[in-house]
Structures are given as C-alpha cells and as structure tokens.
C-alpha cells in the first residue's frame, strides 16, 4: 500500500512528497529489526528513492544510490533488470550531466503521461553530439510513436538511425517486428530479420529471431499448400 502511494505521488509530479514518504517508512522499518520482510521492504523503498533521484536529475546521488542498491539486491529481484538498465543508460551521460537532467525530466513526464511534451524535449535532446544519447532519444521517440499507433512515423525514425549503437541494433529488431506482427508483410520481415542476423551474428537475440523465422517459413509454406 505504501509503495502504491509513493507511485501515485511520483506519477502526479510530487517528487519531494514521495521522498518524504520513503524516508518516513524507512525510519519506521528500522525500528523493527526482527521484521520478517524488513530487507525486502527496505529494498523496495530504496528502489523508489533511487527512482526519485533519477527523475530529479541528481546524477551523482542517483549513481551512488543505484550502486548501493545493485550490490544489495539479488539477481532474482523484480527490479534487478530495471536497475541494471538505468545503470547502463546513466553511463552514457557521464560527461553530459546537463543532458542527463533533460533526459530524466523527460522520463518523469512520460511517467506522468505527458507524451506531447516528452516528444518535443526528445527532439531537442537529439541535437546532442553524444552519439549514444542521440540514438537513445531517437529510439525512445520511436517507441512512443509506436505506442500511439503512429507506425509509419516510428519506422521513419528507426530507419534514420545508423550509428551502430545498441539502439540501432534494437531498432532493426523492432522494424522487423512491425512488418512481421503489425503489417503482416512476412517477406519484408524475413529480409529484415536476415539483415539483422547478418549484421549481428553473435547477438543475444539471434536464437529467438531464428525461431521466429522458422515459424514464418512454415506460415508461408502453409499458404502455398492452400
């Protein structure tokens, strides 16, 4: 229930109030040393605290909190992947902390369902000379457009990415999946999947793509039999 209240405050933009609630609950928990689920609850509260620091754009504080939490939690923890993803992204901004403030503000606006403002600010972030930040902004813009149903625009943005970053790699997969699952253009999807495997033969996504290609081939063979 407490985590839910904190989430509501964050979603409404009340980051300071959310932090006060996090700190208050941590103080209460620390009084009950024998509490059976104390560690789990503390990790959840620390996760929320780290999230608040992220949304506030406090780069150094957020990283310290993030590193501490990553060391504390187990790999099976529900927030582990999110924390590792945030850590990876934060490294892109090591020399561009002003851009980190912009990026974190955008993420908070997305959390508050302010997609129009988010898109405008992502466009501004694309002007950066940092290649990773540039393609991160493009990639996120494309994802928002995709979620809004603006498929063609999403594909245009994806097609403009060519810097061979992790986001370029992911964009190739998304473009193939759009043709595959949304447009049902299986022949185009096959070409895009095969292009991906050719460019990234050692990708962690290769096995799943090969499985999907096999299913598409079977679908096309079934259509030919009909």
List where the protein language model places each region.
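Acidic, polar-rich low-complexity tracts and alpha-helical solenoid repeat scaffolds
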Residues: 1-226
């Amino acid at each position: 229930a407490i985590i839910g209240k904190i989430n509501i405050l964050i979603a409404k933009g009340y980051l300071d109030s959310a932090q006060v609630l996090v700190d208050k609950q941590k103080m209460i928990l620390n009084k009950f040393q024998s509490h059976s689920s104390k560690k789990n609850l503390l990790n959840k509260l620390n996760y929320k605290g780290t999230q608040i620091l992220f949304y506030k754009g406090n780069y150094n504080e957020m990283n310290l909190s993030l590193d501490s939490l990553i060391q504390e939690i187990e790999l099976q923890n529900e927030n582990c992947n999110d924390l590792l993803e945030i850590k990876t992204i934060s490294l892109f901004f090591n020399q561009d902390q002003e851009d980190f403030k912009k990026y974190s503000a955008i993420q908070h606006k997305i959390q508050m369902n302010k997609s129009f403002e988010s898109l405008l600010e992502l466009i501004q972030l694309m002007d950066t000379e940092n290649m990773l930040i540039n393609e991160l902004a493009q990639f996120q813009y494309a994802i928002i457009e995709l979620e809004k149903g603006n498929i063609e625009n999403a594909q245009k943005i994806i097609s403009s990415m060519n810097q061979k970053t992790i986001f370029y790699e992911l964009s190739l997969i998304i473009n193939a999946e759009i043709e595959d699952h949304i447009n049902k253009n299986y022949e185009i999807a096959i070409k895009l999947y095969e292009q991906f495997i050719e460019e990234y033969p050692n990708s962690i996504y290769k096995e799943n793509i090969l499985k999907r290609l096999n299913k598409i081939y079977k679908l096309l063979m079934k259509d030919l039999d009909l």
